[in-house]
């Protein structure tokens, strides 16, 4: 079982992620913005972060850069779950420290497959 933080300003997206991942045995922690996400990342050990790119307060690129400064986030996979599919934005995300990318709308089996590959240890 992995502990997964999902950071998205959309409660329905966070709920959808939870509905897909919890039955597979994962513990899903939710955050609605960058500040909540950072606080929850600092509060406990995480196996994976799934974040949106476009959020109201601060975008996902800034969140990834902040997470990558935390000693606890070294080597931790971070996946973007976003409507963006632009190659330039994907390269920016990779440079910031993103491990993977899933485009919304997503299929539950796609999310499970990506999570399964990244949290296997």
Each language-model region and where it sits:
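Charged docking surfaces used in two-component/phosphorelay signaling
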Residues: 15-23
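Active-site beta3 strand of CheY-like receiver
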Residues: 45-50
């Amino acid at each position: 079982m992995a502990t997964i933080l999902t950071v998205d300003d959309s409660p329905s997206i966070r709920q959808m992620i939870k509905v897909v991942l919890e039955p597979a045995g994962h513990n899903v922690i939710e955050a609605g913005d960058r500040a909540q996400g950072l606080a929850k990342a600092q509060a406990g050990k995480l196996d994976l972060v799934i974040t949106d790119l476009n959020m109201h307060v601060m975008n996902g690129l800034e969140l990834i850069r902040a997470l990558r400064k935390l000693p606890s986030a070294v080597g931790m996979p971070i996946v973007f779950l976003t409507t963006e599919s632009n190659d330039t934005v994907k390269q920016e995300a990779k440079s910031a420290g993103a491990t993977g990318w899933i485009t919304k709308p997503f299929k539950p089996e796609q999310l499970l497959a990506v999570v399964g590959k990244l949290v296997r240890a």
